Amino acid sequence: MICFSGNRRGIDDRTGMNNCLKALKQIVPVAEKANVILNMELLNSKVDHHDYMCDRSPWGVELVKRVGSDNFKLLYDIYHMQIMEGDVIRTIRQDHAVFGHYHTGGNPGRNELDDTQELNYKAIARAIADVGFQGYMAHEFIPLRDPLTSLGEAVELCVV
């Protein structure tokens, strides 16, 4: 299940962290009882989601550690984190234990995973496989060409 941190609305990182913790301490026990994993999505606040709180991997990783439950993880959105911080493969290798789900999308533009964008998805998919990830990678992009063809190409690109 995907959840979100909400927007900053003028509050600092520490206050935002405490607000998220307060809410998650109430919600996560329900998820644990139902055997559901909550994945808080990392989004960029630079281009698409101005003011979003959980916009950097280190902030999200710290939140996961503070919540302290196997039923709370991060959704690592590769497109968004490329915009915010880059260094995608190193981050995946370093923090994979707290990533419960992945989203793809070409950057720039959030379009197809092709040679018009800056991310090497074959290498990224290999890194995700190398760390033993057994969950899902969802293709979340806006195709400029035929959607089914674009999806098929994205799936093929990420098979390692």
Question: What are the residue ranges of the model-derived segments?
Answer:
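Active-site acidic/histidine proton-transfer and metal-coordination neighborhood
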Residues: 1-73, 83
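Histidine-acidic metal/acid-base catalytic patches
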Residues: 37, 54-76, 80-160
